[in-house]
């Protein structure tokens, strides 16, 4: 059951990443059509923009995210117990020892970030250290180091880049349509046939509405899917689903965080603001009860 869940989640992740690229390509094509009647030019701009943005984000994402969440780096002497648990779980996961941070917040939570296993970092709140025993901490840190081992930290960075580029393209197209009236010149309008007008309307709707909406939904689906995978991988590392189950219940019943950055919400083991939508489509995390049910089946 455990390995079947891991394999299924990896397949879902691959499909979601393909969907991201398809959405980006279609949005780029729509942009190229609206601006110059050359869809291929828009596709090149979208892909090149994504690559440039990714290279910028690649430099040092961990430091930026830790700063946004008010996390403070520690050494072994500052908290030997936490340090040794992270060290032990990193050894079991066969990843390099990440940098360790503590967030001064009484609500229990944790997250991992970085660009790859060699440049990773984990952060836990003061609340999680106070409320959880070693078994529960191992479950939580096993989950976070699974994100590192499974390259979820890289996937989340790529997802942020793709959503950012799609949103930028949508905003640029919106301004163009507002100031230029959505057409290239009056002669084009007189000469355009019904099919061309239909294509133009479809391009506008997709670039301005459906593209950004689809990208956001794909990003949320990716985040939820990687949480399931990290849960399963944590059990693979600890051989003890009860530790993570108990930890998730404590986090679910806690107060929202005060120090968390909203743009980083998807990185945490559980939504730090405890706000869940009715449909769950825009949730960054799966429902806690669903996660616990899956863990109980392992």
Swiss-Prot record:
It comes from the Bacteria. One of its GO terms (cellular component) is plasma membrane. It is a multi-pass membrane protein. Binds 1 zinc ion per subunit. Keywords: Cell membrane, Hydrolase, Membrane, Metal-binding, Metalloprotease, Protease, Transmembrane, Transmembrane helix, Zinc. The active site is at residue 144. It is found in: Cell membrane. It holds the Pfam family Peptidase_M48. One of its GO terms (molecular function) is metalloendopeptidase activity. The chain crosses the membrane at residues 15-35, 39-59, 153-173, 197-217. It is an enzyme of class 3 (hydrolase). Zn(2+) binds at residues 143, 147, 227. The keyword Signal does not apply. Its EC number is 3.4.24.-. Its cofactor is Zn(2+). One of its GO terms (biological process) is proteolysis. InterPro entries: HtpX_protease, Pept_M48_protease_HtpX, Peptidase_M48. PANTHER family: PROTEASE HTPX (PTHR43221:SF1). Belongs to the peptidase M48B family. This is Protease HtpX homolog.
């Amino acid at each position: 059951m455990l390995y079947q869940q891991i394999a299924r989640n990896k397949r879902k992740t691959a499909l979601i990443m393909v969907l991201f690229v398809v959405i980006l390509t279609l949005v780029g094509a729509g942009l190229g059509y609206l601006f110059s009647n050359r869809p291929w030019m828009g596709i090149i701009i979208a892909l090149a923009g994504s690559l440039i943005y990714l290279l910028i984000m690649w430099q040092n994402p961990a430091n930026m995210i830790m700063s946004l969440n008010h996390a403070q780096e520690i050494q072994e002497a500052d908290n030997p117990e936490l340090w040794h648990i992270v060290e032990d779980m990193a050894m079991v996961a066969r990843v390099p020892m990440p940098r360790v941070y503590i967030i001064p917040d009484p609500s229990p939570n944790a997250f991992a970030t970085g660009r790859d296993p060699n440049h990773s970092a984990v952060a836990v709140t003061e609340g999680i250290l106070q409320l959880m025993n070693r078994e529960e901490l191992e479950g939580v840190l096993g989950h976070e180091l699974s994100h590192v081992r499974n390259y979820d930290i890289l996937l989340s960075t790529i997802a942020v880049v793709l959503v950012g580029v799609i949103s930028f393209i949508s905003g640029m197209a919106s301004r163009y349509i507002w100031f230029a009236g959505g057409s290239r010149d009056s002669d084009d309008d007189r000469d355009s046939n019904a099919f061309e007008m239909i294509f133009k309307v479809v391009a506008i709707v997709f670039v301005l509405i459906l593209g950004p909406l689809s990208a956001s939904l794909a990003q949320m689906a990716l985040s939820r899917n990687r949480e399931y995978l990290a849960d399963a991988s944590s059990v693979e590392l600890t051989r003890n689903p009860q530790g993570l189950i108990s930890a998730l219940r404590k986090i679910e019943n806690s107060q929202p965080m005060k120090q968390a950055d909203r743009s980083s919400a998807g990185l945490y083991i559980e939504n730090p603001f405890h706000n869940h939508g009715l449909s769950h489509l825009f949730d960054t995390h799966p429902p806690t009860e669903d996660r616990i049910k899956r863990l109980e089946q392992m």
